[in-house]
Design a protein with these regions (language model features):
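Conserved catalytic core of two-component sensor histidine kinases
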Residues: 36
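Thiotemplate assembly-line natural product biosynthesis machinery
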Residues: 1-17, 68-75
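C-terminal structural segments of small proteins and small subunits
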Residues: 52-74
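Phosphopantetheine carrier-protein modules
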Residues: 10-29, 48-54
């Protein structure tokens, strides 16, 4: 799942280096607009709804965290 999420994010957001950081939000690499875009892309690609409760820094700080969230939400 991680590889699929990473490939998708690299395609959609080539200006962001998702591979080098494990603190994308904490380091200021992702802002609220970027997170909104990621939510839209993941929702469409994986057919999931990301509830408000899941929109927390920990779920967006790394590709691993994003992939874990997608897997959780897919059931």
């Amino acid at each position: 799942m991680k590889e699929k999420v990473l490939a998708l994010l690299k395609d959609e957001f080539p200006e962001i280096d998702f591979e080098s950081s494990c603190a994308l939000v904490d380091d200021g690499i992702l802002d609220s607009l970027s997170i909104t875009g990621i939510i839209a892309v993941l929702s469409m690609e994986f057919g999931i709804i990301i509830p408000y409760e899941e929109i927390v820094e920990d779920n967006f700080n790394s590709v691993d965290a994003l992939a874990d969230m997608v897997e959780r939400l897919r059931g």
